[in-house]
């Protein structure tokens, strides 16, 4: 699995801590971490949590990433931004129980975490434990186990509702302020990382018009 890490500007200084915790947990599982930044608070490209949603949607819908880890001060804004787009089901994860139940009950493809609220002494340990529960035990297996059938059924119903209420991603992007879009893909390593992994030629061609 290719796991993308995205940080917005208010918590960009923690990017290295988050990346280290994520890699420590998931690389031994055989997953790959791709860090799209922000890498530091003074990066030239300043991502807002709204732009994290745009970038996450581009990565997931294009196949450039299979999963996205992101967040903001509380995680709430990033979660709302990601869930504004088709092809993205983002949970809000504060602790390992959130991580495990989201993986097995909701079976999404992104999480938003609080990187300021509650992030004190031992914060990196909480990240590691969350990532262990998020990626270490599979997905969509239900919790409690005896609830797996109705939970999987409800997940399929939700997927159907979302398919009916969202329009294709490129149509969504064309309706958004171009400057907001350009800022979302302005990261110093975006082009290098994205085009090497993108599996959707149409979306790749559209993204090139933003650069």
Give the ranges of each region predicted by the language model.
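Short, solvent-exposed amphipathic alpha-helices that sit
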Residues: 14-29
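Short Gly/Thr/Asp-enriched flexible loops that form oxyanion-binding sites at enzyme active sites
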Residues: 77-90, 94-97
